[in-house]
Amino acid sequence: MKVIVCGTTFGQFYMEAIKKFPEKFEFAGIYAGGSDRSKMCANSYGVPLYTNFDDIPNDIDIACIVIRSGALGGKGTEIALKFMERGVNVIQEQPVHYKDIAICVKSAMKNKVFFKTGDLYVHLPEIKRLIDTVKEIEKHQNICLLY
């Protein structure tokens, strides 16, 4: 399956995941603003960097949207919708406002594609450690509130 990653800050986690499964995924490119970081990532992974949405090939199977969602002042949701209109399945990284999720789910159904919000955070070592710690505390006492 051909995969494109949109965004290169947190998107690098997705790039590494794609790289680990070359038998399942073909890293088809990066869609980003053209910063030095995005150029460096494209060069490092040996994939094209697209800065214009219309230049992205039409044979992409999955788009990983790792750009701020509309609720956070970014264009992630807008980009997700554009991909789904093209018939591309979308994984959009959190946080995504529930209204944006509803819009994306409707678009996915209309365009007969899949839409999923990412859950990469729960797999990060620090978050796993926090979850394990909270579970251990819960064995000994009830937790009323976490800050």
Residue ranges: model-predicted function:
Residues 48-107:
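Beta-loop-alpha module in the N-terminal Rossmann-like domain of NAD(P)-dependent dehydrogenases
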